[in-house]
Amino acid sequence: MKNRLGTWWVAILCMLLASHLSTVKARGIKHRFKWNRKVLPSSGGQITEARVAENRPGAFIKQGRKLDIDFGAEGNRYYAANYWQFPDGIYYEGCSEANVTKEMLVTSCVNATQAANQAEFSREKQDSKLHQRVLWRLIKEICSAKHCDFWLERGAALRVAVDQPAMVCLLGFVWFIVK
């Protein structure tokens, strides 16, 4: 009876590890909305033209999510106060070539992002040096998180975040079976 109860606890632990609750990086859009702001009058709600979402390489994706990235003490305070102004993703598909390495992908992603968002980089702000430093660090982190699916097929990259909970579960089950 005690052995079965232990097996159930290991199974529950494995389910929690496999759910990847700890790897979620977004924290929500808590400070994005200004609740006391008056609503501007609209133009009758009629749509006059269709707008197509721009998916050019390097385009920022801004959804108001707060990413879990360390910018240093001063940068963390600035990012926490202004995260809704920063991108939380970059549209970039750089896996068209068969022999793309991780370094090539990150470099081309950063270059495409810089070319596509010149207005954002040239924007003058009172705290522009800190803003630019946080923005560049954010771009480098987002680009370095990108990967090509064919890397996994070739076995060139090991997805530790996915494989680690599976290995812990496997070791736990083997330990209980042997015991």
Curated annotation (Swiss-Prot):
Disulfide bonds: C95-C148, C109-C143
Topology term for the membrane: Lipid-anchor; GPI-anchor
Gene3D superfamilies for this protein: Prion/Doppel protein, beta-ribbon domain (1.10.790.10)
Residues spanning the signal sequence: 1-25
GO annotation terms (biological process): acrosome reaction; intracellular copper ion homeostasis; protein homooligomerization; single fertilization
Repeat among keywords: no
Disruption phenotype: Mice are born at the expected Mendelian rate and appear grossly normal and healthy. Females are fertile, but males are almost completely sterile, in spite of normal mating behavior. Two independent studies conclude that male sterility is due to impaired acrosome reaction, but describe contradictory effects on spermatogenesis, possibly due to the use of different mouse strains. Spermatogenesis is normal, with normal sperm counts, normal sperm motility, and no malformation of the sperm head or tail.
Region (Cu(2+) binding): 125-142
Post-translational modification: N-glycosylated. N-glycosylated at two distinct sites. O-glycosylated.
GO molecular function per UniProt: copper ion binding
Region Flexible tail: start-end pairs: 27-50
Protein name: Prion-like protein doppel
Residue span of region Globular: 51-155
Propeptide positions: 156-179
Family: Belongs to the prion family.
Localization annotation: Cell membrane
Gene Ontology CC: external side of plasma membrane
Source superkingdom: Eukaryota
Glycan attachment positions: N99, N111
Name of the gene encoding the protein in the UniProt record: Prnd
Tissue note: Detected in testis. Detected within seminiferous tubules, on round and elongated spermatids (at protein level). Not detected in brain (at protein level). Detected in testis, and at low levels in heart. Expression in brain is very low and barely detectable.
Pfam family, any one: Prion
Function as written in the Swiss-Prot or TrEMBL entry: Required for normal acrosome reaction and for normal male fertility. Can bind Cu(2+).
Domain remarks in the Swiss-Prot or TrEMBL record: A short helical region is required and sufficient for Cu(2+) binding.
Record lipid sites (GPI-anchor amidated glycine): G155
